[in-house]
Regions:
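Generic alpha-helix detector with strongest preference for long hydrophobic helices that associate
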Residues: 30, 77-85, 101, 132-133, ...
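Flexible mid-to-C-terminal extensions adjoining Fe-S/redox cofactors in radical SAM and related proteins
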Residues: 111-199
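Generic detector of isolated residues embedded in canonical secondary-structure elements
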Residues: 18, 48, 101, 147-150, ...
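Radical SAM enzyme [4Fe-4S]-AdoMet core and its adjacent flexible, acidic
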Residues: 1-91, 95-99, 109-118
């Protein structure tokens, strides 16, 4: 609702040059659940954000939003620089997380004991531990929906956040927020690239 005011504050009061919006997702465990955005809200937010970022660029502001910047690089460079939004969830593949006891998890957002990949005290290599976990842990289930079949953004998304799905017991389902963000941001980015506003 206050995208412009938030960006004005970050750019002109705090003099930030970059930031990243992480949208609150539907989450049964979080008291902030009423702050969660749903598909129509995500489309509105993404379009407002893109409009304001374009306006700030026209005013000469040196400011970027991290999720949009990564998606632009996905299109322009295929750099796969984000382990979350460049080629689907890469938790356990391009990143792992450790707890205070040396247990290894596929992502810092997941701590279910059944999702543990292994331990730093095991003799197996991380590759062997991940391969074993990928055969049995729900975190690694592929995510697909009927609309994914012909989605032009599937390469980048691949169903979205696996941790979110585990917390909501939606294993194998897509992350609706990530899907809506991709369907709203990528077409706008292509338009901006074709108009010469992003290079």
């Amino acid at each position: 609702k206050y995208v412009k005011e938030i960006l004005d504050y970050f750019i002109y009061t705090l003099h930030l040059t970059s930031m990243k919006f992480n949208l609150v997702r539907d989450n049964d465990h979080a008291p902030e659940q009423k702050l969660a955005l749903y598909e129509e809200d995500v489309f509105w937010f993404a379009n407002e954000l893109m409009d304001y970022l374009q306006a700030y660029r026209c005013l000469g502001a040196n400011f970027s939003e991290g999720n949009i910047e990564v998606r632009a690089k996905n299109l322009l460079q295929r750099s796969n620089m984000s382990c979350c939004i460049s080629h689907g969830c890469q938790g356990g593949r391009k990143m792992v997380s450790f707890d205070h006891e040396g247990n290894i998890f596929p992502c810092e957002m997941i701590d279910f004991p059944e999702e543990k990949i292994g331990s730093i005290y095991e003799k197996d290599s991380i590759e062997i531990m991940v391969n074993k976990a990928a055969q049995q842990n729900k975190f690694f289930l592929p995510k697909k929906d009927e609309r994914c079949k012909e989605c032009p953004w599937w390469y980048y998304c691949q169903g979205g956040c696996s941790s979110r799905n585990r917390y909501l017991n939606r294993d194998g389902q897509i992350d609706e927020v990530e899907c809506a963000l991709n369907r709203s941001i990528y077409p706008r980015l292509i338009q901006e690239i074709l108009n010469g506003n992003i290079s």
